[in-house]
Amino acid sequence: MVADSAFLDNSYIKSFLSNQILSDSQNINFNDLENKFASISHVQDVAIYKDLIGNLNIGIKQYIPIARIVSGSLSDNYINDEGHIFPISSRYSKRVLLLHINEKFSKDKKLTSSKFGKDLLNMINYINDDEFFSKIISELEINSSKNIVIHPQFSKQKIIFGYPDDLEEKFEKINLFYNKIVPAKGWNTYKTVNVKFKNQIICDKS
């Protein structure tokens, strides 16, 4: 039995399998076949075995995207929650946080190879794990100085976040803006909201 997954459905897996084993289904090298499946860029882990009645079982764990890089040297790639970078697919697209990155990370396809990459990943996971922020934040813009600007989903202002640190404090200020200031002043009164400085929230109309 072959389990469906987002990037690799039954049809794709069966076609890939038939191309690998051809007509000799009785003499399958499972390690070799697992390695061939593992070489597919969207596969995180794979286990292949035969059950007691001879059925071939394939279990595939795919990478689950949590953000998509849409600019910079790594554009057209997804990121998973552990920082693995893998390509988008024509077979499947998931709506996730968009990243405009002006920072070149490592060549080993791992976001966590640098301190900034680890801190950025922590911020992305923080957003995705929060019910409120995951709904209102659609894009992150990362400049060459490693400062981040948040682009909300439903309003026009930019939120200047700065370096992805002090997450609890900065997101609490963003929460304060949307729950206290916006109801009093309106959604699009301010063009920028700056939360990068400690103990300050600066709202600018210009």
Where are these regions (language model features)?
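Flexible glycine-/small-residue-rich
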Residues: 2-3, 60-64, 100-103, 152-154, ...
